[in-house]
Amino acid sequence: MFNNLKAINERPKPFQYYTAAELWTDEHTSKKMLDYHLNEEIDVSSRNARFINRSVSWIIEKFNLNNKSNGLDFGCGPGLYTSRFAERGINVTGVDFSKRSIKYAAQIASSKNLKVNYINKNYLEYETQDRFDLITMIMCDFCALSPKQRGIMLNKFKELLKPSGNVLLDVYSLKSYNQREEIAAYEFNHLNNFWSPEDYYCFVNTFKYCDEKIILDKYTIIEKAQTRVIYLSLIHI
């Protein structure tokens, strides 16, 4: 038991493990994430609806987007931004590797007769011959990538942008980093069965890396049939 607890509380290296796919593509957690996305009153998986509406208006004005503009949203989720861009006449593509979120986004676009090109793919692997006036990565997606992955995306931005194109990222600030504290906590059925529909025990460890300005949340999920570990690393800029 002592060795098990020691392993649970062990501090990994920043971005040593990449488990995003387990969070976004798992049948159960992807449904939970979609529920968070669609709750317009909270800022969890997405910003609240009022913030999104203001942001879309600001983005369109800031970058002079119109019905001749082509936009690309990496990590589009259920289309909260892409659908609003399409409603304003912008040609938009959304890429996300959550099959559930893309399916929902496509259904909404169809019901509203919106022309949005949705692609179910890991954006690290996305390729196209199309070129774009604006590329967005919203809700701090860029911060969840390792240095190598960020390099891949920067090269992808350069490749996919038109000569006069722009990139819009939102990122976690150093103020946000300073507000976080290291913790070690334990909870039965953590976050109201977020990790599994069955009973489980969850150990939560938050680690801070001062030199790199990284926050790493480590979730050790102990179920009757298996034990899983999910790592969520976020760099603050």
What is the meaning of each model-derived region?
Residues 2-66:
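Conserved class I S-adenosyl-L-methionine
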Residues 78-88:
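Conserved SAM-binding loop of SAM-dependent methyltransferases across substrates and taxa
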Residues 98-100:
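Conserved SAM/SAH-binding beta-strand->alpha-helix loop
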Residues 111-125:
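Conserved SAM-binding strand-loop segment of SAM-dependent methyltransferases
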Residues 127-134:
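A short acidic, Gly/Pro-enriched loop at the edge of an enzyme's catalytic core
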Residues 151-163:
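A short glycine-rich, Lys/Arg-flanked "PGG" loop and its adjoining helix->strand segment in the class I
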Residues 164-171:
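Conserved beta-strand signature within the Rossmann-like core of class I S-adenosyl-L-methionine
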Residues 174-235:
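SAM-dependent methyltransferase
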